[in-house]
């Protein structure tokens, strides 16, 4: 109730990558709590090519990124926002935050990330622009002296503990993006399962064939 009263009629500029429809769920929840949300994908496009370039060599499309954020400034110039809410901050440029701060001095800048800074270092360079900063990574919270906020779950899972138990098909299940040491660690666990009569299933998500080929050739953890 307190949160609903606080967000009632507040205008929020929400920037987030598109990830398994979570950005839509967040937007809908904020609106359910009474906020008026203007959403933009953090990336200039959501195709696998752009995702791959951002991860491998962002400078190749930096001009396009800057133009995209200049357009956001123009499109939102007539709206007086109460909050800027950036989720993840993978490519949000510093000039955008500086210009928005000048144009909207009463707007509070809030940052949250559900990714570790070891996977995406760019957000570290823009943290200084935010009034409130949160991360799901407890190590990053300590290292960078920012607020720790554990990863959330959707309302649809609130009552999952009360549902009827299902027979498990697998003893070990991994679903996630293949980055850092995840593939190496999960492969070790799969081998352990095979040697001890346990069942396992792993599904690795990657941002397109370009990223996969790069990892396969240059990243030893994928050998």
Kindly label every feature range from the protein language model.
Residues 2-56, 67-71, 88, 94, ...:
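Nucleotide-sugar donor-binding catalytic core of glycosyltransferases
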Residues 59-65, 86-89, 110-116, 220:
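Short, flexible loop segments at the rims of nucleotide/cofactor-binding pockets, characterized by
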Residues 76-77, 101:
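Short hydrophobic patches on amphipathic alpha-helices
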Residues 80-82:
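Proline-aspartate-enriched helix->loop->beta-strand connector
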Residues 97:
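Short alpha-helix within the catalytic core of nucleotide-sugar-dependent glycosyltransferases
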Residues 100-116, 134:
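Active-site proximal beta-strand in glycosyltransferases
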Residues 116-117, 123-124:
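Conserved nucleotide-sugar donor-interacting segment of glycosyltransferase catalytic cores
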């Amino acid at each position: 109730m307190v949160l609903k009263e606080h967000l009632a009629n507040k205008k929020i500029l929400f920037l987030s990558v598109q990830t398994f429809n979570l950005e839509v769920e967040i937007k809908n929840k904020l609106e359910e709590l009474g906020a008026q949300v203007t959403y933009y994908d953090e990336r200039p496009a959501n195709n696998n090519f752009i995702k791959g370039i951002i991860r491998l060599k962002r400078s190749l499309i930096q001009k396009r990124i800057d133009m995209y954020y200049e357009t956001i400034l123009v499109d939102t110039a007539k709206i007086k926002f109460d909050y800027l809410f950036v989720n993840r901050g993978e490519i949000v440029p510093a000039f955008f935050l500086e210009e928005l701060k000048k144009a909207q001095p009463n707007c509070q800048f809030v940052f949250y990330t559900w990714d570790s800074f070891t996977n995406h270092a760019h957000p570290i360079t823009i943290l200084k622009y935010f009034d409130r900063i949160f991360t799901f990574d407890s190590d990053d919270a300590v290292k960078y002296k920012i607020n720790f906020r554990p990863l959330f779950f959707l309302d649809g899972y609130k009552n999952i503990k009360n549902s009827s138990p299902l027979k498990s098909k697998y003893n070990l299940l991994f679903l996630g993006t293949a980055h850092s040491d995840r593939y190496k660690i999960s492969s070790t666990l799969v081998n352990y399962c095979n040697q001890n009569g346990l069942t396992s299933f792993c599904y690795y998500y990657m941002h397109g064939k370009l990223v996969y080929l790069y990892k396969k050739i240059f990243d030893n953890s994928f050998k």
